From Swiss-Prot:
The keyword Protein biosynthesis does not apply. Heme b b562 binds at residues 84, 183. It is a multi-pass membrane protein. The gene is mt-cyb. GO terms for cellular component: mitochondrial inner membrane; respiratory chain complex III. It comes from Typhlonectes natans (Rubber eel). Heme b b566 binds at residues 98, 197. The chain crosses the membrane at residues 34-54, 78-99, 114-134, 179-199, 227-247, 289-309, 321-341, 348-368. Keywords: Electron transport, Heme, Iron, Membrane, Metal-binding, Mitochondrion, Mitochondrion inner membrane, Respiratory chain, Transmembrane, Transmembrane helix, Transport, Ubiquinone. This is Cytochrome b.
């Protein structure tokens, strides 16, 4: 019998080994769909972004009105803009669920895959931040001013660094044009890094809900999981279409419908909802440098999780105390998200400080401690 082309052709062979004949554990749940959903989000964002970039002008004088032009005069421009803006929210929903799945089922023990995943999270956050500046509304301008200003906390070179990033003495035209450049460039860097993420994942194979070796029970990715992923695609695209057509401004700040004005500061400067937990941690520390370090560490702490794994079992499926800690982390992160959107006044300041301290204590102390306790409880 003649050899199958998909198994012999140099290029098709890579696709075949990644998407068709890939041996996959038979018991992975829908929580394993978020990786492919993130790929779909990235493709959607790149495509809609490309069409938006054809009509957008990265200039302080015309950026805001070019957005109005896209929404009013360009064929389906309103839809492209709404899908792109809400697609970012869906991107972060998927990425947070993907990370949560990784923590719960011990997928972080694939260290290279996990660390590249954390780098991907940082890249996605950077892309979303520079993208939020582009409409040049009030929150775009002041968000850019506040967040880039945190670089000034770096000792000795801080002020020079901020002015270097701004391209002047304030957030202005030079800042907008370079942010547009970064926003265009970074998604392609994310796509390339995602390939590395998959490369390392396919070196080990997927984890599964039990955390046990599944080599004795593998099935081909296609048709079983390709159809399962397609079902996930349909649900997510339907939800994105529904949000983008019926309530497109649900996630956005009304302040951003006012053109940027350096002379008028909005009453409450806050980022999009997906950054609020980190923003709450930044705000809860009175010292500027301390706040910046806490902000950075709130994400980089994910890289420490593999080193803090003290359990004898990989997955939390059979570890009740660790499950309690996991859901405490989720609840605490939701509290931080709520606090990040509130004004800086009592009782929110105190709640934010307690939640921020608890965030680090849960990850660094209580999670390893409960892992160890579970070992004792289960006589391992």
């Amino acid at each position: 019998m003649a050899p199958t082309m998909r198994k012999t052709h140099p290029l098709l062979k890579i696709i075949n080994n990644s998407l068709i004949d890939l041996p996959t554990p038979s018991n992975i749940s829908y929580l394993w769909n978020y990786g492919s959903l993130l790929g779909l989000c990235l493709m959607t964002q790149i495509l809609t972004g490309l069409f938006l970039a054809m009509h957008y002008t990265a200039d302080t004088a015309t950026a805001f009105s070019s957005l109005a032009h896209i929404c009013r005069d360009v064929n389906y421009g309103w839809l492209m803009r709404n899908i792109h803006a809400n697609g970012a929210s869906f991107f972060f929903i998927c990425i947070y669920l993907h990370i949560g799945r990784g923590i719960y089922y011990g997928s972080y023990l694939f260290k290279e895959t996990w660390n590249i995943g954390v780098i991907l999270l940082l890249l996605v956050m950077a892309t979303a931040f520079v993208g939020y500046v582009l409409p040049w509304g009030q929150m775009s301008f002041w968000g850019a001013t506040v967040i880039t200003n945190i670089l000034s906390a770096i000792p000795y070179i801080g002020n020079n660094l901020v002015q270097w990033v701004w391209g002047g003495f304030a957030v202005d035209n030079a800042t907008l044009t370079r942010f547009f450049t970064f926003h265009f460039l970074l998604p392609f860097l994310i796509a390339g890094t995602s390939m590395l993420h998959l490369l390392f994942l396919h070196e080990t194979g997927s984890n599964n809900p039990t955390g046990l070796n599944s080599n004795s029970d593998k099935i081909p990715f296609h048709p079983y999981f390709s159809y399962k992923d397609t079902f996930g695609f349909m649900i997510m695209l339907a939800a994105l279409a529904l949000l983008s057509t019926t309530n497109p401004n649900l996630m956005s700040d009304p302040e951003n419908f006012t053109p940027a004005n350096p002379l008028v500061t909005p009453p409450h400067i806050k980022p999009e909802w997906y950054f609020l937990f980190a923003y709450a941690i930044l705000r809860s520390i009175p010292n500027k440098l301390g706040g910046v370090l806490a902000l950075l560490f709130s994400i980089m702490i994910l890289m420490l999780i593999p080193s803090l794994h003290t359990a004898k079992q990989r997955s939390m499926m059979f570890r009740p105390l660790s499950q309690l800690m996991f859901w405490s982390i989720i609840a605490n992160t939701l509290v931080l998200t709520w606090i990040g959107g509130q004004p800086v006044e009592d009782p929110f300041i105190l709640i934010g400080q307690i939640s921020s301290a608890l965030y680090f204590i849960l990850f660094l102390v209580l999670l390893p401690l409960t892992n160890w306790s579970d070992n004792k409880m289960l006589n391992l």
